[in-house]
């Protein structure tokens, strides 16, 4: 789930690379954004249910979330969005807690990065189910993009 992103030299604040930030495993908020990389969205990224769902609805939900977010920002005079670090850390803990009840997180598979020598073993997809994920995203939006810093 990180390979395509690591093949691009993505740089955030102060020139820090995404690969450097995710050296110990990907950290995202809702699988859509990562702290330190303002205005950067990922579609079906780590921390989202993407690969464990029918990809078309996942992609559509992400595109709708992002486009609605951009519209909200324009309507409210914002030009920058970035997840708050605490929101990102809390989401990561939730993703791990949900994964820990499954055997998938213990298997040597690409889900944990076992297909890449030296890559940290981290279960990256959100396994809590697509409906539950959508509810969480909708709650974030309903609460004024809770967990995000807007400027």
Regions found by a protein language model. Give the residues of each.
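Flavin (primarily FAD) binding-site architecture
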Residues: 1-13
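C-terminal, flexible cofactor-proximal segment of oxidoreductases
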Residues: 28, 41-151
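E1/E1-like adenylate-forming module used to activate ubiquitin-like modifiers
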Residues: 11-46
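Intrinsically disordered, low-complexity, compositionally biased regions/tails
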Residues: 7, 19, 148-151
């Amino acid at each position: 789930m990180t390979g395509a992103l690591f093949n691009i030299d993505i740089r955030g604040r102060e020139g820090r690379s995404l690969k450097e930030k995710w050296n110990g495993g990907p950290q995202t908020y809702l699988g859509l954004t990562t702290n330190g990389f303002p205005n950067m969205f990922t579609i079906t990224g780590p921390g989202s249910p993407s690969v464990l769902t029918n990809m078309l609805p996942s992609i559509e939900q992400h595109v709708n979330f992002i486009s609605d977010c951009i519209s909200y920002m324009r309507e409210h005079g914002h030009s920058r969005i970035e997840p708050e670090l605490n929101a990102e850390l809390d989401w990561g803990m939730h993703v791990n807690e949900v994964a820990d009840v499954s055997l998938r997180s213990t298997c040597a598979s690409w889900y944990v990065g076992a297909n890449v020598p030296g890559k940290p073993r981290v279960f990256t997809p959100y396994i809590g189910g697509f409906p539950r994920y959508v509810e969480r995203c909708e709650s974030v939006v309903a609460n004024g993009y809770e967990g995000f810093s807007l400027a």
